Amino acid sequence: MTELAKSLAGALTGAEDLHETLVAELARAPLSEAEADALLPLIRREAEAALIARLDQLDAGFLTAVIRHACGHAPIPGSAAIQSHLKNAEVAPVMSPDPRETRATALPSERPRMPAFSDRAFDAWFDGLREGEEMLYGYGLYGEKRRVYMADQYRDASGPEPRSRHLGIDIFAPAGTSVTAPLPGYVHRVAYNADPLDYGHTVILRHATEDGLPFWTLYGHLGQPHVAEGDEIAPGQTIAPLGDWHENGGWAPHLHFQLITSLLAQTGGNFYGVGHDSLWPVWAGISPDPNLILRLPEAVFRL
């Protein structure tokens, strides 16, 4: 392991794309799960100052997930068990009225003649669409590549590739619409993420499987939350209203709903809402399709 770590430290030093280099190098040196989990600290120990400084800017949990994936293991060990649990769990709706019982339309980011979600013209366009089609909700798609994610917060020191694939499902509705908890749990974090095109008001809930495996749900682009960190939450309980432009990061009013199987090295009230296209299998293990919880018919995601 020491020789491998030394070799990897050399390959990563000066590499344009750390993720790409890790995956390529480890394809020739498959490791056990225990070895994969232990590798990153060994690389740091063998690295020179410039590489250590670069690694310090990145999420160590995500790098370990990349290493695990490159070695043929599940990026997140408990992800499959969490997804299996959710397939059979009883869930409440995440908004009121219940999206499962309400007419809706798909809002792929490249929908013809649709203004961008960050363009204030979207509101009038969507209001007209809702009135014309007699429906309440619009859905932004999980796993969709979006051109809007070009701001600096979607890039990092790993390399030139921005994070551009959406890790949640968006539910567009009027500001003030009630956002509710689908599962029992506790409030993990309440935060205001103020950067332009960030989440604005954000709530993260912590849940657990019957075997005690933790997982989380994230609610972004809210109005002022009705809950506080540490609160116990019941299914159907109101978390917050849907936020408007001035408080939700600068987006047309909508809920970003995301399932998270590992918080990686993130300890605050924010989490990655988009992932690298080239590493989609890793990101899909971290944040699987949240329709496991929403239970919306697949037809609503198609035009």
Cite the ranges covered by each PLM segment.
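Polar/charged, compositionally biased leader and regulatory segments
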Residues: 1-170, 282-303
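Histidine-centered active-site/metal-ligand motif
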Residues: 166, 207, 221, 254-256
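Short, conserved secondary-structure segments in the cores of folded domains
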Residues: 175-178, 223, 229
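A short beta-loop-beta micro-motif enriched in histidine and acidic residues
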Residues: 165, 173-175, 198-200
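Generic structural motif
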Residues: 171, 177-187, 233-236
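Acidic, glycine-rich catalytic/binding loops that coordinate metals and/or anionic ligands
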Residues: 85, 94, 98, 228-247, ...
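Short beta-turn/strand-loop junction motif enriched in small, turn-promoting residues
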Residues: 176, 190-193, 243-246
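Zn2+-dependent peptidoglycan hydrolase active-site motif and core
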Residues: 181-223
